[in-house]
């Protein structure tokens, strides 16, 4: 289930301050500060630019699985697709800042409301009592809102072969599918096969003989 999680931690004696701070952030954030908003977007993009090559293999695998798995397609929206979305936001921010601000306000008014709020507390009896006592600092100014109905996103399967150009010299190549869609089921034997393929075949032929940085395979219980 897709959720937005806002976390905070404090000493028991400071729970009131934490609740007040969370309340200010959720209920009174000023989205009209275009300079600060642009700074945050550029910081987010810079972080992705720096880490993109470090997790190239995972990005490629997520993109690959999104071709044939609806769940993976949804998860991939926060991966490489998100990076391209972020690039577009930064590149067009000056001319589209008012639209972006309106969208943020709309999303906040739907998410940060009492009717969609779930509170989880970790601690002992004293901590729970402190949270119960000061929770009003978080929710007093929160809109009532309306319960959000479940929205089903339709993701069509797409058989795509694609490549992405980067300034790095390391290539990440992936190939995969879902074996359950071909009539096979998951058993413990696949763990053995995974080890054999990874270390006896791929390691020797791709890593040792081919000179690549590494190669691996994996079989998930859902068939991916």
What are these regions (language model features)?
Residues 71, 100-135:
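Non-catalytic, conformational "gating/processing" segments within enzyme and secreted inhibitor domains
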Residues 2-105:
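Acidic/histidine-enriched segments that form metal/cofactor-coordinating
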Residues 97-107, 207-215:
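Short amphipathic beta-strand starts and helix->beta connectors
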Residues 2-3, 19-20, 81-85, 112-116, ...:
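Short acidic (Asp/Glu) and glycine-rich catalytic loops that position anionic groups and cofactors
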């Amino acid at each position: 289930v897709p959720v937005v999680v806002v976390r905070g931690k404090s000493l028991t004696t400071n729970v009131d301050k934490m609740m007040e701070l969370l309340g200010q952030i959720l209920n009174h954030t000023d989205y009209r500060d275009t300079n600060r908003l642009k700074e945050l977007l550029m910081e987010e993009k810079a972080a992705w630019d720096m880490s993109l090559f470090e997790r190239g293999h995972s990005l490629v695998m997520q993109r690959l699985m999104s071709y044939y798995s609806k769940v993976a397609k949804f998860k991939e929206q926060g991966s490489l697709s998100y990076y391209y979305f972020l690039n577009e936001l930064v590149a067009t921010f000056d001319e589209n800042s008012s639209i972006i601000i309106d969208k943020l306000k709309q999303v906040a008014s739907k998410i940060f409301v009492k009717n969609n709020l779930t509170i989880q507390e970790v601690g002992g009896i004293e901590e729970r009592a402190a949270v119960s006592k000061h929770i009003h600092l978080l929710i007093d100014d929160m809109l009532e809102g309306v319960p959000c109905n479940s929205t089903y996103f339709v993701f069509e399967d797409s058989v795509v072969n694609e490549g992405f150009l980067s300034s790095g010299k390391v290539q990440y190549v992936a190939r995969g599918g879902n074996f359950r869609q071909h009539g096979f089921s998951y058993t413990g034997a696949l763990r053995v096969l995974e080890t054999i393929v990874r270390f006896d075949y791929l390691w020797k032929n791709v890593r040792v003989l081919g000179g690549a940085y590494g190669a691996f395979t994996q079989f998930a219980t859902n068939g991916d």
